[in-house]
């Protein structure tokens, strides 16, 4: 019914059933506002098991709460009630699951357009058609953000010209904008991809997961921060039926974390891991010589895109420590960064002050 009729309807019904309410046989009638009813009707639903389970399972995985439901005795329809704000998302989920199943749509929000983010966007652009044709998977980038601008569109960003679109049509970017726009769009089957090295962006993961948005992070900060934060994010993801993945935190494109997960899940206990965990340091030590000074090898590592934007993160051992902590945690150990012993080959005072001072010292 219309919102303006709700109060009168409650009054009439409570008056009609006043005796039953007084005797405690029924509860007083109350009105819940801003709701919507969706009905699925189909002849083929009759005597077909699993339709209701598929429907409510799909809604649940996308964070849509069903307030009430009913199924007709003829088994040809299911009606249910959701919040009005979830109506569009519910319809999209149902159409994708039941009627438009030629492709499974995955809606991506990509934060960061630098070396990692830019390469990912280009890879998606090149593989979109192949994935649709061979895997039935339609990757749609519905949001892109860098340090200056953020662009969101349900229709999907044209990845061939995303830089121009971002500069011309994008709004000023901030973590608050990312938070509000991504959650506010309320899009089904959505994934937030963090290609930054920002602690502020990492702080958004919890709210995204709570709103049934999966998180895939190249950013190491969340998975290597306090163990309580790492553990909470994984627990929320499990409870909400979404993913919190960070495979590229260690080993770039190699499936190291996934392999550790498989070993642990099959009952193995990992006692020791040996690895060269810093591509930057490995590159520097291979290049440094009497002819190539230390400072030049650092510059070369940056030019070859081995190094972090701030090379001190690599040289201080911070990046390696983060990777060690992540590997240990995935192997089942409750390790903090402070538990890792480090021996630096660069004097401590090199890491003090601004980046310009560091370059002068090396």
What are these model-derived regions, one by one?
Residues 1-122, 127:
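A conserved regulatory-domain signal marking ACT and ACT-like small-molecule sensing domains
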Residues 4-8, 50-54, 73, 82-89, ...:
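Conserved active-site and cofactor/substrate-binding residues in soluble primary-metabolism enzymes
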Residues 7-14, 53-60, 88-95, 117, ...:
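Predominant activation on well-ordered alpha-helical scaffold segments within soluble catalytic domains
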Residues 68-69, 191-194, 215-218, 244-248, ...:
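General beta-strand structural signal in soluble alpha/beta enzymes
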Residues 106-113, 117-211:
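N-terminal glycine-/serine-/threonine-rich beta1-alpha1-beta2 phosphate-ribose binding loop
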Residues 287-288, 295-362:
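Substrate-binding/catalytic subdomain of NAD(P)-dependent oxidoreductase enzymes
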